[in-house]
From Swiss-Prot:
Name of the molecule in the record: NADH dehydrogenase [ubiquinone] 1 alpha subcomplex assembly factor 2
SUBUNIT field: Interacts with ARMC9.
Organism of provenance: Bos taurus
Residue stretches of biased makeup (Polar residues): 144-155
Principal localisation: mitochondrion
Compartments where located: Mitochondrion
Region of interest: Disordered: 108-168
């Protein structure tokens, strides 16, 4: 069955007007192809394609960065012309310089942060009581007079008076 599929593929490619033109390679060994717009044997217009043939054939082995950013932009049609090797090397050098500068900045910022933390007093331990939305965190004690009005109304509590002349 494998030989029949290969034969069918050869016949299909022979009848097709698809012309695969290699436009470049990268340092990883990936090959990039351009197929211009053409009409197939049925008269349908097939739009242009940009294809990468990866050096490692399986998709599972793909990792981010295996295809340079410039080639990826060309494949996604965000740039019209394929990148040159000199352009890729120049951009790679710029990326490395930016990474070194950001690392230096991060280290300087870390030192400044440590120095400013030495000048500050240590944080005071705070005691958390209740919930943040609660209006009062202390112990509720009943009062003789009513408190507040509306939804938060609390009636006053009754307290008996001891010396009022009660008969016993």
């Amino acid at each position: 069955m494998g030989w029949s599929q290969r034969l069918f593929g050869v016949i299909r490619r022979a009848l097709s007007k698809e012309v695969k033109e290699q436009v470049g390679t990268d340092r990883f060994g990936n090959k990039y192809y351009y197929i211009p717009e053409y009409k197939n044997w049925r008269g349908q217009t097939i739009r242009e394609k940009r294809i990468v043939e990866a050096a490692n054939k399986s998709e599972i082995d793909y990792e981010v960065g295996d295809i340079p950013t410039e080639w990826e932009a060309w494949i996604r049609k965000t740039r019209q012309t394929p990148p040159t090797m000199e352009e890729i090397m120049k951009n790679e050098k710029c990326r490395e310089e930016i990474q070194m500068k950001s690392q230096d900045f991060y280290e300087k910022e870390k030192l400044l942060q440590e120095e400013s933390n030495k000048e500050l007093p240590p944080p005071v331990q705070t005691q958390i009581k209740g919930h943040a939305s609660a209006p009062y965190f202390g112990k509720d004690e009943p009062s003789e007079s009513p408190t507040s009005t509306g939804k938060t109304f609390q009636p006053g509590s009754w307290m008996p008076h001891g010396d009022k002349g009660h008969s016993q």
